[in-house]
Amino acid sequence: MSQDSKVKTTESTPPAPTKARKWLPVLDPSGDYYYWWLNTMVFPIMYNLIIVVCRACFPDLQHSYLVAWFVLDYTSDLLYLLDIGVRFHTGFLEQGILVVDKSMIASRYVRTWSFLLDLASLVPTDAAYVQLGPHIPTLRLNRFLRVPRLFEAFDRTETRTAYPNAFRIAKLMIYIFVVIHWNSCLYFALSRYLGFGRDAWVYPDPAQPGFERLRRQYLYSFYFSTLILTTVGDTPLPAREEEYLFMVGDFLLAVMGFATIMGSMSSVIYNMNTADAAFYPDHALVKKYMKLQHVNRRLERRVIDWYQHLQINKKMTNEVAILQHLPERLRAEVAVSVHLSTLSRVQIFQNCEASLLEELVLKLQPQTYSPGEYVCRKGDIGREMYIIREGQLAVVADDGVTQYAVLGAGLYFGEISIINIKGNMSGNRRTANIKSLGYSDLFCLSKEDLREVLSEYPQAQAVMEEKGREILLKMNKLDVNAEAAEIALQEATESRLKGLDQQLDDLQTKFARLLAELESSALKIAYRIERLEWQTREWPMPDDMGEADDEAEPGEGTSKDGEEKAGQEGPSGLE
């Protein structure tokens, strides 16, 4: 092999950075991997927020577990460092498109405040342990600068969790705990600075039995801080200026914290009520209306029981209003994932186009019937079909007691009445009484909605009508002669309509020609009128001629005046 071929072979091998990119992919900020990494970062950040300040204020805690603290400290530092690497491999949206170019990601990240805070949180301030000793955990306070990452993790979890209100309450409790924890640590540090047991306000002297234990020190400080910040108990009065300042700061913090907590709890409760109102109908107005209209107690009880069933069993009747803010395509996908399996079980909709079923799914209206309530009665005009989602319906006689059959979940009825099938002996009227045995959840599809959708799918309409004829033939409810007569009548009507359409086209053509002729005649008349107007302007009228004689200059008279003047001068000339 020649040297040139060796060079070409070497150049054709893929470079090493391409392999590295496979091992370090770009993360989608809305993806699962990024979400779980954020949740992982919660632990080192919470560790630094809670443990570092506690170790700084409780010396016994720092001295007793020094090796464990070193391991946890540098483990959290390692996670902090990895988090910076993750930030360099996390894409961002530009013009709605995820940017995966690592150079652009890095350039954008290093120009943000987040990068400066991340670097500052990793400054090795604990290197001062070499000179100051390993018992000064306050050197690690710069690790608190990574707190914005904690807030980001909480926000992502709140949007992803199935119980956002419960998570908001839990997040609020975490904030309250951290505030009380910090306050208790500062209280113990201030007591140590002022002297344990110097007065009733500071922490008691550890020389007393029981107060020397670390657990008692922390719990007493936490209890004292809870009393101050919640203002729900008697606390010893301060005796020194430092104690007064601490109490004033705590009281101000308590006022702000109380207002924040009440506002947050009110917001959570309001959101819960708003969500319930959006999902489930409010029965207060209906109850008030029934009382004002003096509805009988039995009917009022049935209405209230129906509302209670919806509320207790979390039944929704306004799915369209709930999903109205979603884009149309996304709303269709949600409806398909929820209801398509139910709709595809209906015989007349089997083997239909997927797009047709998707549009029909959006038209399904959930309905809930209470025990003993009739869904339809024999002889009623059928304007909708029903699909049983949950519950049992009975086909009963006219007396409402005798049962002929029981329909369960997944069955359907009324599908023939919403399709205009020629020769249907029952027409569009119901042929049976159907009553709900218990609480039943149904899907309703109206004839108008089906007609609106089928107007764009004529082939599917023909297929559905053919399936409906097959069903009626099996039920012996299809009059073939009547169907043939209706078909003949329809063909005759269509033929007449075609003839009328042809006549209408001919009339339109004649009318267009007549209109064109009228426009041409109008143009000719207008042209002739315009010529006459110009001619009348050029020819003088009799009155104008008399005025011209009066205003004529000497020597410029008419031919008659010239003749008279010549006749008078003739004799004189002869003389």
From Swiss-Prot:
Assigned keywords, A-Z: cAMP, cAMP-binding, Cell membrane, Cell projection, Coiled coil, Ion channel, Ion transport, Ligand-gated ion channel, Membrane, Nucleotide-binding, Olfaction, Sensory transduction, Transmembrane, Transmembrane helix, Transport
Coiled-coil portions: 493-547
Activity control: Ca(2+)-calmodulin exerts its inhibitory effect in cAMP sensitivity by binding to IQ-like motif of CNGA4 and preferably binds to the channel in the closed state. Inhibition by PIP3 of the CNG channel probably occurs via CGNA2 binding.
PROSITE patterns attached to this UniProt entry: CNMP_BINDING_1, CNMP_BINDING_2, CNMP_BINDING_3
Tissue: Expressed in the olfactory epithelium.
Residues where 3',5'-cyclic AMP binds: R430, T431
Membrane topology: Multi-pass membrane protein
Domain of life: Eukaryota
Transmembrane feature ranges: 39-60, 71-91, 117-135, 141-159, 167-190, 214-248, 249-273
Region described as Cyclic nucleotide-binding domain: spans on this chain: 354-474
SMART domains: cNMP
Compositional bias (Acidic residues): 544-554
Pfam families associated with the record: CLZ (PF16526), cNMP_binding (PF00027), Ion_trans (PF00520)
Subcellular localization(s) per the UniProt record: Cell projection, Cilium membrane
Catalytic activity: Ca(2+)(in) = Ca(2+)(out); Na(+)(in) = Na(+)(out); K(+)(in) = K(+)(out); NH4(+)(in) = NH4(+)(out)
Record function comment: Pore-forming subunit of the olfactory cyclic nucleotide-gated channel. Operates in the cilia of olfactory sensory neurons where chemical stimulation of the odorant is converted to an electrical signal. Mediates odorant-induced cAMP-dependent Ca(2+) influx triggering neuron depolarization. The rise of intracellular Ca(2+) levels potentiates the olfactory response by activating Ca(2+)-dependent Cl(-) channels, but it also serves as a negative feedback signal to desensitize the channel for rapid adaptation to odorants.
Full protein name: Cyclic nucleotide-gated channel alpha-4
